[in-house]
From Swiss-Prot:
Domain of life: Bacteria
Name of the top EC class for this enzyme: hydrolase
Keyword Mitochondrion carried by entry: no
InterPro entries to which the protein is assigned, alphabetical: Urease_gamma (IPR012010), Urease_gamma/gamma-beta_su (IPR002026), Urease_gamma_sf (IPR036463), Urease_subunit (IPR050069)
GO BP terms: urea catabolic process
Pathway: Nitrogen metabolism; urea degradation; CO(2) and NH(3) from urea (urease route): step 1/1
Catalytic activity: urea + 2 H2O + H(+) = hydrogencarbonate + 2 NH4(+)
GO molecular function term, any single one: urease activity
Organism: Paracidovorax citrulli (strain AAC00-1)
Family statement: Belongs to the urease gamma subunit family.
Identification of the protein by name: Urease subunit gamma
Subcellular location: Cytoplasm
Amino acid sequence: MELTPREKDKLFLFTAALLAERRKARGLKLNYPEAVALISAAVLEGARDGKTVAQLMSEGREVLTRADVMDGVPEMISDIQVEATFPDGTKLVTVHQPIA
């Protein structure tokens, strides 16, 4: 199977998000990379589902709460930017203050 670098990045992100999802389900608090991966994957999947950039910017803030992550993680993540593919092309989605 031949994958482009972008496809490899998306696959890596999905794998990291899947691991984060499983750890969260076990009651573990997520670290920085796990939190970023889970929120980013939610944005990518939302774009695939046909949601708008505005919807994803809003929904991206609801993926995780402070209780879901280790101490200090919310302060480390001021913005998450994800280049997502929409039906009308690729767009940059920025989620501001993703962990409330």
